[in-house]
């Protein structure tokens, strides 16, 4: 058999000066979006001035500069301040989450399962329904209890996301098989069946999450 000719490598154009700046912007953007960086802003409620100071510190480190003050004079007080902020935020956030669950539990349209999942089926969809081992395509929006959207297919061109139901948070594994193709469900997930004590990225630790999910397709 004749040898197959490999496809030509794609031609990558050199970046313009403006695009080079955008490339480094993206490097910084994705660095901060890593979970350990995103949690700084989430847990500490940084003001604009504090964000600016944080960026100044990063800029100095990138340029191999040294602080213009004695770090040892600041570090003990900084650790105390950060600890107090984290504890205060956790207490306030816990109260918000409890109040949200109480509101949901007072809504007779929601049902509750043994795991603590609260759900309301908006549209049941058609049979057959997926199983907990199925791979599905869904449209969805996820919010924290303060109404902030932390993830949504609407921000990605409204293209359905594909994933195996045994590879997502337990709340999804339990809830999505309740609907069929074309179905919609509103689910409220306590932290124990969501992202737990650690949180993830913009999601604070011990967060109750609200999802609206539409099942577009059962892939397999």
Locations of regions flagged by a protein language model:
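Cross-family detector of peptidyl-prolyl cis-trans isomerase
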Residues: 1-220
């Amino acid at each position: 058999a004749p040898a197959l000719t490999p496809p030509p490598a794609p031609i990558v154009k050199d970046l313009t000066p403006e695009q080079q700046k955008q490339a480094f912007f993206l490097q910084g953007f994705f660095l901060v979006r890593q979970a350990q960086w995103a949690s700084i802003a989430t847990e500490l409620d940084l003001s604009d001035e504090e964000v600016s100071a944080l960026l100044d510190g990063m800029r100095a480190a990138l340029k191999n500069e040294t602080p213009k003050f004695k770090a040892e004079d600041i570090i003990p007080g900084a650790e105390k301040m950060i600890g107090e902020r984290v504890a205060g935020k956790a207490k306030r956030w816990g109260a918000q989450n409890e109040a949200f669950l109480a509101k949901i539990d007072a809504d007779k349209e929601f049902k509750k399962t043994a795991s603590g999942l609260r759900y309301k089926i908006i549209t049941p969809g058609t049979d057959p329904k997926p199983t907990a081992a199925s791979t599905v395509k869904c449209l969805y929006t996820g919010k924290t209890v303060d109404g902030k959207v932390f993830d949504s297919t609407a921000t990605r061109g409204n293209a359905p996301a594909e994933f195996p139901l045994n590879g997502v948070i337990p709340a999804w594994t339990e809830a999505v098989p309740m609907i069929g193709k074309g179905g919609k469900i509103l689910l409220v997930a306590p932290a124990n069946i969501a992202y737990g004590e650690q949180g993830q990225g913009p999601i604070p630790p011990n967060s109750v999450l609200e999802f609206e999910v539409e099942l577009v397709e059962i892939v397999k």
